[in-house]
Amino acid sequence: MIALAEGELSTPHVYREFDRLQVARPSGALEIPTELLQALRAGDCVQLGSALSNDLEGVAVSVMPVLSKTLQAGLDLGAIGAMISGSGPTCVFLTRSHDHSVNLAASLSGAGVCRSVRIASGPAVTSISNG
């Protein structure tokens, strides 16, 4: 489920702040969290929800604090995972089913923490390879 938080956010500004604050790491180093890989291999959507992350999220929230309200509202309303998409202000929520997404979208809309919501779907858990 996707929600656009209230307000606007400049992508170049978020990236500049990220670059300014980023602790040096080896060039080109990409670290995929072990918890994320384990959740994907196991097909465990609850573990996957806990493992969702975005390196830009902290910066985006510091530039636009209302994002944290949108993310927290989604979790409080039953999402099993939440994160900022890209540099924001788009928030994405992991749900258990299409019906769960529909209910969450209606609840978030009613909570007044976003300007619009959309339902998105992906592959079924059974299509995730355990190998």
What are these regions (language model features)?
Residues M1-L48:
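Anionic-ligand binding region
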